[in-house]
Amino acid sequence: MRDGLNQSPLNPLPAAVWLLALPVIAAEVVFALGRAGFVGGAEGVGLRLSAMQITAFAPEMIQRMWSLGVIDWDQLYRLVTYSFVNGSLTHALFVLAFTLALGNLVGREFRPWAVIVLYLGSAAGGALVYTAAMSLLPGRPAPLIGGYPAVYGLVGAFTFLLWARLAATHANRLRAFTLIGMLLLFQLVFGVIFGNAGYGWIAEIAGFAIGFGLSFLLVDGGVARALRHIRQR
């Protein structure tokens, strides 16, 4: 009984999850200090905008490379850096909440390097799919900024784990997609109410699909081992 009392009521987060969350936290701290006048001097108020300009992903970048047949290696970092700078504090808080919660769950089944590859791969893949889609849609595409495509990759990995668990118990595997359905419904309602839906959801859905697909390759031991591990629980 005493041993149980000595245990922490909170499960420690995997180091890989902190590695993904800390850049977002650090950025928001710097932005807050800038608004308060402690960092950046007179330009401190605009630190978030400056960071967004440096890290945002613009589809035109890939479209230009494709048309010219060259790769601008100096700009490819934007495929992943856009996911660590968010448009507002509220945006960052939502991203952090999902990253910590879902990252903790996914990190129990994936190795640390796999969690990082999953997160960054979903961000980069979501950006590329967004670029391809926007080349077919009218209007000038808005730049991507914020961690939602990467977070949706974690949703995809979590969905994979639920899907594998339901498959092991011969239950309806479609139930595993309840979370993504709820998120999409919430996003639709939010976009209709505030009128700022845009096309960013394309990158987010792509991030989900990529996260789900990568899980078959990245989960420790593959699908067979994941099913055996779940049965033992």
Labelled PLM ranges:
Residues 1-233:
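A detector for small-residue-rich transmembrane helices and their helix-helix packing motifs
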